[in-house]
Amino acid sequence: MTDRSSNEGVVLNKENYPFPRRNGSIHGEITDVKRRRLSERNGYGDKKGSSSKEKTSSFEDELAEYASQLDQDEIKSSKDQQWQRPALPAINPEKDDIYFQQIDSEEFTEGSVPSIRLFGVTDNGNSILVHVVGFLPYFYVKAPVGFRPEMLERFTQDLDATCNGGVIDHCIIEMKENLYGFQGNEKSPFIKIFTTNPRILSRARNVFERGEFNFEELFPVGVGVTTFESNTQYLLRFMIDCDVVGMNWIHLPASKYQFRYQNRVSNCQIEAWINYKDLISLPAEGQWSKMAPLRIMSFDIECAGRKGVFPDPSIDPVIQIASIVTQYGDSTPFVRNVFCVDTCSQIVGTQVYEFQNQAEMLSSWSKFVRDVDPDVLIGYNICNFDIPYLLDRAKSLRIHNFPLLGRIHNFFSVAKETTFSSKAYGTRESKTTSIPGRLQLDMLQVMQRDFKLRSYSLNAVCSQFLGEQKEDVHYSIITDLQNGTADSRRRLAIYCLKDAYLPQRLMDKLMCFVNYTEMARVTGVPFNFLLARGQQIKVISQLFRKALQHDLVVPNIRVNGTDEQYEGATVIEPIKGYYDTPIATLDFSSLYPSIMQAHNLCYTTLLDSNTAELLKLKQDVDYSVTPNGDYFVKPHVRKGLLPIILADLLNARKKAKADLKKETDPFKKAVLDGRQLALKVSANSVYGFTGATNGRLPCLAISSSVTSYGRQMIEKTKDVVEKRYRIENGYSHDAVVIYGDTDSVMVKFGVKTLPEAMKLGEEAANYVSDQFPNPIKLEFEKVYFPYLLISKKRYAGLFWTRTDTYDKMDSKGIETVRRDNCPLVSYVIDTALRKMLIDQDVEGAQLFTKKVISDLLQNKIDMSQLVITKALSKTDYAAKMAHVELAERMRKRDAGSAPAIGDRVAYVIIKGAQGDQFYMRSEDPIYVLENNIPIDAKYYLENQLSKPLLRIFEPILGEKASSLLHGDHTRTISMAAPSVGGIMKFAVKVETCLGCKAPIKKGKTALCENCLNRSAELYQRQVAQVNDLEVRFARLWTQCQRCQGSMHQDVICTSRDCPIFYMRIAEHKKLQQSVDLLKRFDEMSW
């Protein structure tokens, strides 16, 4: 139970985790400012806290609007009744079919019998669990020469004995082909070995791969035998063989399934079992592309910790939990509640539950989850913080039933530490918690995987995608709110409720759930694989499905990784410069997938010279030689499996896009758009799968052949365009390809107008496309005008797809889109480019740049513009790095606020002593502001701004571009006077005259004797300065009040991702110093 009589405990808001936090004061009102200095205009607000008459926040208005949409009788009725799922209609297993959308699946072994559990929801909203039985795991080995069918029974017995018994169920012979390498289209016998359960399949596999099985000398001892499809997860094997894909609909035919009345294991409304042979998987098309009425629950917790220490679930209590439950397809939540320790004033449109102690609250919330029975759990950082913390806290309090959060009786959820690592997403330490029957969609993980942002705090993400800031409350203030009154806890509850509501809004805005659903359907993997696994599993699933249809088996290749590399894509040397004529851009549509299709590149078509000679195949007739010397048979000999997969994906995408244009229902449109995007991503990932040297099935012959064809095509495109579009062929100018990169070329036709450039671009695309085999197609999509070409992979220009107006300013490789520099760089480069490209005012761009540099050197740039963020990706670095060293220093100051692996660390570069290494000069921005530590403006100019500025100005100004970094505008330099560190440790502060700065004795008046005759003038000047700073601070304060939704409460937000926050701290510091100076006049005798 929380001890509210003590002020020693402080509340830590989990939203700040895993983002850097530190102890510090909250910058609020300035006290002791006398009324003679216009204090009635300071606008700081009422300090008495919330009251019943206070204007409601904007979020409260939204809650009221939700409440108004509900029937009044429904509002007055018991909330518990609203939580329940719809009543189950009468179902006769002998006569009634059951259709449901399966959302979660797991493998389960009961005794020694394996089964699959499919959790789902029917079209009526009823929950269901289906036990699928009868499916056994298996793998293949190639039958050796001399192996006869009559040997099969003895082979099975001997193999089982070698595996120590109870492992092999039975074996059969099937005619298959090895997927890897062309062998003449002839099938050969393979032994299909079924094991009794998935956990011991590896035992049988190892017997073959280690050469431990000797059967009539056909499998020599000590010689390893390649196994096929022996490393496939049992659940995925079942889904592949039964054509089940993630999130699709399942049909249980009447009389084929049975209800499980005895020994029910779940709290689902329907529980049944069926043999896998009778289950019907429905393709995710037409009416079966719909979504069931899934229940989506978003939640957030607030927990209390000790001062300066991050909450420990074994000690620190959970004080509030907010939950919002929405049915998929509805815009209005049907459940909005907050579970609170201690009393809490009512919140409009929200059910508030008060509890005397924490154990009661946690136990009731766990029961609430089971009663409302959500299909999807969402939130922000719930996987790494909320769920594990709740479980550990309940364990500490010995609340036995709390971990029963899933749909299986007596299954206690436990959080486990995991490390996720992939080339695409990097390395992240995280936690996973099994909650059977419920999907977990952590919006923080979604953001980190799908978007490259400077910061992943909820506030930064909401600002980016929802266009609004979020109040971020410092944990020391949350302490006061919790230990205060029912009204103050109401404010905390609204804050908690909003943090539960925002992930739902983000999910809806970005269509994350529907996009991931379609990705699961397209690739065939379970939904939860999409966040927990990398890219390869998606291709593996598609490859195995198509291999099954063509009687191909996939070898289990042991890969230890290799340093072997292949040449990448071609980049045509750029003709750098500023182009004030239209530049047409020609792009190859789906270049790498189309190359694999056009040239039949696949595992199944890969040929070696010996096989070609043995089968008497003819070069250029039966097989082709790629530019890097690999052999692949032509389609009339064998159609490759990868080209078939790619053709199916791209054709399905065309169909989805065509259906999207005709569809009018917004939810169906969202599904179709998510589907076409998933199909595009899946097609593009096939090439990467073949080139992953540490992957499941690497084949550098395929990946290097693809890039070699790509290089050849780019060079050929350049040659064809420049030879055709010449003056001698009747055109007004000689065309020049000024740049080419991977799958596109930029062409200067020499014409002056957009319509002419677009016409020639369209014509050239069609002409070049005819030079290549189908389905390779060069498309004209856009014109850049004007165009700034800086270097390889660095350019900017106005993007035109129609002649009446430009679409956007587009840039690549320039600091406007990079996140490893401070925001000032992006702002300056973006503004300068807009002046040059949109306004075509190069002089204005120069003047703007000089003004920013001058402000930087005079310490006039806001701190928020100087913050650099870098990812902390591992614990050990070969070299000392600024963000790593700062993270360590922050850990020593306050271990609870230290960044964790995978977080982005925010820092600024400060002035250091001569000889200080760069990594020693990184510092926490808040610490810098609080202690007046001077920023190293020279570093920002020379290491952050200079190179990007020279890159964009040199193509226009040439050598004169360097004048931007030197001259009159750089001669005035000022910096803050530090209050800590360095020589200040030994300095003795001496008071000076406020008029002439002459030293005076401490405790004397504000002015020296020489300035006393100017006392009235100097006093008025100081009052004016205070008034000016009061107004500036009040404006920032008011802006923050508007953001928090209340003009009558103190601002308690400490969002490090908001520029207003840094401004408010800086102005507060200036105002406090100015007030202190003004107080010195009080000591004078007037």
Curated annotation (Swiss-Prot):
Cofactor: record remark: Binds 1 [4Fe-4S] cluster.
Gene3D superfamilies: DNA polymerase family B, C-terminal domain (1.10.132.60), DNA Polymerase, chain B, domain 1 (3.30.342.10), Helix hairpin bin (1.10.287.690), Palm domain of DNA polymerase (3.90.1600.10), Ribonuclease H-like superfamily/Ribonuclease H (3.30.420.10)
Gene Ontology molecular function: any one: 3'-5'-DNA exonuclease activity
Enzyme nomenclature, EC number: 2.7.7.7, 3.1.11.-
Family to which the UniProt record says this protein belongs: Belongs to the DNA polymerase type-B family.
Keyword Secreted attributed: no
Region annotation (Disordered) ranges: 1-64
Record protein name field: DNA polymerase delta catalytic subunit
CDD domains: DNA_polB_delta_exo, POLBc_delta
GO biological process: base-excision repair, gap-filling; DNA replication proofreading; DNA strand elongation involved in DNA replication; DNA strand elongation involved in mitotic DNA replication; DNA synthesis involved in UV-damage excision repair; DNA-templated DNA replication; mitotic DNA replication lagging strand elongation; nucleotide-excision repair, DNA gap filling
Domain of life where this protein originates: Eukaryota
This protein's GO CC annotations: chromosome, telomeric repeat region; delta DNA polymerase complex; nucleus
Cofactor(s) required, per the database record: [4Fe-4S] cluster
Annotated InterPro entries: DNA-dir_DNA_pol_B (IPR006172), DNA-dir_DNA_pol_B_CS (IPR017964), DNA-dir_DNA_pol_B_exonuc (IPR006133), DNA-dir_DNA_pol_B_multi_dom (IPR006134), DNA/RNA_pol_sf (IPR043502), DNA_pol_B_thumb (IPR042087), DNA_pol_palm_dom_sf (IPR023211), DNA_pol_type-B (IPR050240)
